[in-house]
Amino acid sequence: MAATMNKTPATTFLLIPAAASLVLLLAAAASVEASAFDYAGAFDKCLLFFEAQRSGKLPDDRLVRWRGDSALTDGFSQGVDLVGGYYDSGDHVKFGLPMAYAVTMLSWGVVEFEKEMVDGNKLHRVLDAIRWGTNYFVKAHTQHNALWVQVGDGDSDHLCWERAEDMSTPRTAFKIDINNPGSEVAGETAAALAAAAKAFKPYDRMYSDLLLLHSKQLFTFADTFRGKYDDSLQSAKKFYPSASGYQDELLWAAAWLYEATGDEQYLRYVSQNAEAFGGTGWAVTEFSWDNKYAGLQVLLSKVLFEQGGSAAGYADTLKQYQAKAEFFLCACLQKNNGHNVKMTPGGLMYVSDWSNMQYVSSSAFLLTVYADYLAESRGTLRCPDGEVKPAEILRFARSQVDYVLGKNPKGMSYMVGYGSYYPTHVHHRGASIPSIYAMNATVGCMESFDKYYNSKNADPNVLHGALVGGPDANDAYDDDRCNYQHAEPTLAGNAPMSGVFARLAASPADNTPEYTPAPNAPSPSNGGSPLEFVHTVTNTWKANGVDYYRHVVTAKNTCGHAITYLKLQIKELSGEIYGVSRTNAKDMYEFPSWMTRLDAGAQLTIVYIQGGPAAKIAVVEYKTA
């Protein structure tokens, strides 16, 4: 470790010549190039989130060291071992339906992008994340026609703000059976186990066979004893109600069993029930833990792409599924004759005011896999508003991921721990309370609301990889734990991103960017500065006769050492600024409150909005480790 240095470099101002400014302004909706994003690093963090959500006895080799063992007696009082699985979000309930959906999506990512995960040295970690869920499902499936689908109660759990390691709330377990059916959750669990069986098959054949056995039994249970799970399980209705019913899950489970086994009986099932169950009738603009139709339609389109004429007996029905899949994709791409997914002004798909990012991640996944299906078959997507090539579909999916990672009007990453500017007040109990290893005293149920939930301090534990609910319909985001609709991450929101990150990391940039990149301002000579600045104007608009510009400045640490203290002078700034903290001294700024160092090669992102010319930025003092 180098000795600490305190340097005052020659002052370096960042200036943009008038001609360059004009060029920048002409590049409407300009942005940094896609290659600026580290998709492999984002993939790594995404997997850390699943570690942070683990319930039960944690392994010694875990990477999330602030988490400890928890809920080690789940189910015991009711005569069943339900230790393990995942906590759903910022609370400590184990909801079976969204957990199973998350495992399905993790597994689908492996099915489609196994090679990319192997090449990126991530496959073993994804399989570990899947196995943590499937081991729990196998334990929860205690009889052919019985499945334990929830541990904990949302109402009582939400009355306390405490760490998982200190839980004092009831851990009541709930099951479905022939008298209390739940076809949605039984079907989704069957789908998860079938998808996981295919993912594990090349690496652990015995385990794959075990998962398939349970999947087949659960599908038969779901189909034979049909009924809405939230009619049988009132405690789930308030938190994860089934709006789409159970028929989509029955088709979804059968489709995954066909994908995993090739057994024609499952293809026959989705064909014979296509119309009655809505598979070829529902044209949707969302894909989620509740509504599986778009995912089902894309998955069955794959059969056509792979088998073509050999699926002759089912081709007509499969083409109807494909038509509905392409309705969804065209709606995402804004080429569906007005029947499109809504977009925010900053370019993010917007489906719901509550946890919208879960719809962004699932849509990005379907767009990504379908783009590859088309590319492999040398096909194109024919939308009402024009033909779309596979590369364009992938480009749009990338634009959504890039928005998540920071290419948005706030310049903020909505994935916690990615980049230098991300949410630091996440609606998550474990992240907001000091770790049991840092503060061994038990944290009380109620008093913790005042001390931690309502605290303005940043989270003491960084919940790396957590995809928060995201901004509102106007791209605004309030970094506040109380803002649970937007600040809470979920298993369902994170899971689809695993496969998307794997795919994008394998081809981080393409030759035809979605937007025309703004020319970078000439980089000034470092002149002793530890930072290399690149300035881009990413948006411009007129209000009350004044032209306003959104400026993004990336400051890369090029000094070869981690910077532990930084003082910047920012002159001629008239608007709001994000990514640095104002000091008491005039025009002086330092690291934001959530940041203590800038590693060698890392970037600090500064965003500001103002009318008139750009601000002038200079490094006036810094220290390195």
UniProtKB/Swiss-Prot annotation:
It comes from the Eukaryota. InterPro entries: 6-hairpin_glycosidase_sf (IPR008928), 6hp_glycosidase-like_sf (IPR012341), CBM_49 (IPR019028), Glyco_hydro_9 (IPR001701), Glyco_hydro_9_Asp/Glu_AS (IPR033126), Glyco_hydro_9_His_AS (IPR018221). The active site is at D91, H427, D479, E488. One of its GO terms (cellular component) is extracellular region. Its EC number is 3.2.1.4. The keyword Secreted applies. Pfam families: CBM49, Glyco_hydro_9. Glycans are attached at N440. This is Endoglucanase 13. It comes from Oryza sativa subsp. japonica (Rice).
